[in-house]
């Protein structure tokens, strides 16, 4: 397993932010322009419905990262990330992320692998949901 924190480039520029439990780390209505590296704590990803309801769709813990899809695809996706415990997060600007990807094949592979894992997790979740009855989907959502 790739140890993200031990492979941070010495010249990597980032901002350290601390978030309290329940604070929003990534706001779906704002453009961040950063890769978020969760250094410590836990955070959850929520999909926001049109009525304001929140559906927990993913959880991060330990050392992980998020925000890469928006940076690399150039599309904003309306997901919110909220701290479920106190968290420390490094924010890496897009230009620094791209430089890091060019210079470190291990990091490039790690990021590709994490994106693939997220894609498979979401695909599995969608498949399981599609097999539920309407009643089961409703009960799962409350």
How should these model regions be labeled?
Residues 102, 106-142:
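Polybasic "coupling" helices that flank or enter modular domains
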Residues 12, 24-35, 53-55, 75-78:
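A short beta-loop-beta micro-motif enriched in histidine and acidic residues
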Residues 1-23, 65-66, 70-71:
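Cyclic nucleotide-binding regulatory module and flanking cytosolic helices
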Residues 43-56:
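A short beta-strand-loop-beta hairpin characteristic of the jelly-roll/cupin
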């Amino acid at each position: 397993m790739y140890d993200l924190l031990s492979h941070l480039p010495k010249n990597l520029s980032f901002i350290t932010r601390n978030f309290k439990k329940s604070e929003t780390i990534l706001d779906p209505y704002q453009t961040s322009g950063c890769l978020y590296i969760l250094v410590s704590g836990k955070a959850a990803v929520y999909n926001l419905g049109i009525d304001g309801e929140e559906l927990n769709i993913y959880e991060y813990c330990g050392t992980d990262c998020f925000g890469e899809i928006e940076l690399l695809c150039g599309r904003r996706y309306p997901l919110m990330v909220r701290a479920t415990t106190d968290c420390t997060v490094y924010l890496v600007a897009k230009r620094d992320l791209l430089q890091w990807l060019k210079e470190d094949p291990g990091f490039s592979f790690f990021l590709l692998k994490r994106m693939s894992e997220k894609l498979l997790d979401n695909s599995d979740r969608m498949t399981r949901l599609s097999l539920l009855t309407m009643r089961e989907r409703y009960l799962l959502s409350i």
